[in-house]
Amino acid sequence: MKLRLSALALGTTLLVGCASSGTDQQGRSDPLEGFNRTMYNFNFNVLDPYIVRPVAVAWRDYVPQPARNGLSNFTGNLEEPAVMVNYFLQGDPYQGMVHFTRFFLNTILGMGGFIDVAGMANPKLQRTEPHRFGSTLGHYGVGYGPYVQLPFYGSFTLRDDGGDMADALYPVLSWLTWPMSVGKWTLEGIETRAQLLDSDGLLRQSSDPYIMVREAYFQRHDFIANGGELKPQENPNAQAIQDDLKDIDSE
């Protein structure tokens, strides 16, 4: 169920971003917009169509779905201890122990995490959107800082992307060498791009794709930091979306 909520949230943030494109309205900082638009054009008009998207299409079409699921489960399992720590830091020991249990069961019984044994055994142990250190900072109201579009990386803020580097201090992530970390990041990026292939039309139809991507980034991280909730006072469409999420959760 949580995965369904996360998937819907990811999709709806793309739509919500169009209706709330004002940086001042959202309280976002984008002082480098000129530079960011240049980097966006490189990332999404050069790098994506000629390199990233073809790789993602090949990944989706030629890698069997069970193999994709297994690799996604494995890379996600590496983050479970860090997610556990972040829930403890947020004052939520119950969710912290949920992620400890997921890591223990999937590592021992799930071939090192390739099989999500915990999620199959108990719906309360299903995989969720990971809470990283950036989410913990957001939980306590720390601001994003300036928004930046980085070449090859995409959207970046000091709070969420810079803060997430703290997660690498915890095992198992701290055990990874630099090439291993790059490999993990690459696999996750390709899988994420493959999942979003069917959403390419949203960007093509947008009058300002840069604004759409920027606001989708903020909306997604707000959603995670707020524990899976959208605040109506921050967006005029949030209440309607929140009602849809509740309807799905009640199924």
From Swiss-Prot:
Region (Disordered): 228-251
Membrane topology: Lipid-anchor
Signal peptide positions (record): 1-17
Keyword Signal part of the UniProt annotation: yes
Lipid-acceptor residues (S-diacylglycerol cysteine): C18
One biological process term in Gene Ontology: intermembrane phospholipid transfer
Coiled coil feature spans: none
GO cellular component: cell outer membrane
InterPro entries linked: MlaA (IPR007428)
Lipidated residue numbers (N-palmitoyl cysteine): C18
Keywords: Cell outer membrane, Lipoprotein, Membrane, Palmitate, Signal, Virulence
Localization annotation: Cell outer membrane
Entry keyword Lipoprotein: yes
Function: Involved in a phospholipid transport pathway that maintains lipid asymmetry in the outer membrane by retrograde trafficking of phospholipids from the outer membrane to the inner membrane. Required for intercellular spreading of S.flexneri.
PANTHER family: INTERMEMBRANE PHOSPHOLIPID TRANSPORT SYSTEM LIPOPROTEIN MLAA, LIPOPROTEIN VACJ-RELATED
Assigned protein family: Belongs to the MlaA family.
Identification of the protein by name: Intermembrane phospholipid transport system lipoprotein MlaA
Organism: Shigella flexneri
